[in-house]
Amino acid sequence: MVRVRPLWPLAAVTALIAVPLLPLAATSQTPKYGGVLVTSPLSAAPSLSPHEESTVAVVQQASPCFNNLVYYDPAKKQESVDTIIPELAEKWSWQDGNRNLVFLLRRDVKWHDGKPFTSADVKYTFDMVRAAPDAKGRLKVNPRKLWYENIEAIEAPDPYTVVFRLKKPQPALLPMLASGYSPIYPAHVPLAEFKNKCIGTGPFKLKENKPGEYVEYVKNPDYFVKGRPYLD
């Protein structure tokens, strides 16, 4: 289980600064299943919808629920695109003079409600974020629309292939897709539900959200990374 509780006192700041040192001492130990993790960001997130927020708090509090197409390898320093690895994507390639970014997706991923993850979800998410004319969802607040203004079109030729067609080459697109603000949303879930709820593909499922108090997650038994997560 994971519980995220906002903390305000100065003592909380000190505790948070000390936290990154703990895993270093534990790296030689064999991971064990079970247990509870309590984390304490310095503020409460306004919602559990990263695409509609700009605070670090929303990433901290919503990230257990979600996955990206790609992400930065947590075992390496985030120094270049060479540290970006697949997550919901199995692999990717640049084509047509780096104007097309093609992703091949994992086939073993389910949303927390049991529905399969497909390319339609990726297209839905980024058509919505870039405010495409034919987008099936609209964000009330869209702080990162400019990130994706170079996208000409997003195509889903089959359930496990996604093509980002660009107006011109954009090497920075991959790092933006690896950002904590770039999770994939389910196309079948109304966007309004993400105000206080969360249906993702991540290692933890939302159990309870008390805005301003805590967000509690439990282990996702169907998580696509076998044997993970370790926490209950």
List the model feature ranges, each with a label:
Residues M1-Y33, K91, A153:
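Short, low-complexity disordered leader/linker segments with a strong preference
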Residues P64, E87, L104, F117, ...:
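Extracytoplasmic/secreted proteins, especially bacterial periplasmic and envelope-associated proteins
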Residues S40-D96, D127, K197-T201:
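N-terminal lobe/hinge region of extracytoplasmic solute-binding protein
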Residues K32, L104, K123, N142-P186:
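Surface-exposed binding/hinge segments that line
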Residues Y33-A44, E90, N100-V102, V122-T125, ...:
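Short, well-ordered beta-strand elements
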Residues L42-A45, E53, P74-A75, G97-R99, ...:
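Solvent-exposed coil/turn segments that connect beta secondary-structure elements
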Residues E90-A135, V163:
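Aromatic- and charge-enriched surface segment that lines or borders ligand/interaction sites
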Residues Y71-E79, Q170-D232:
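Gly/Pro-rich hinge or "lid" segments in bacterial periplasmic/extracellular proteins
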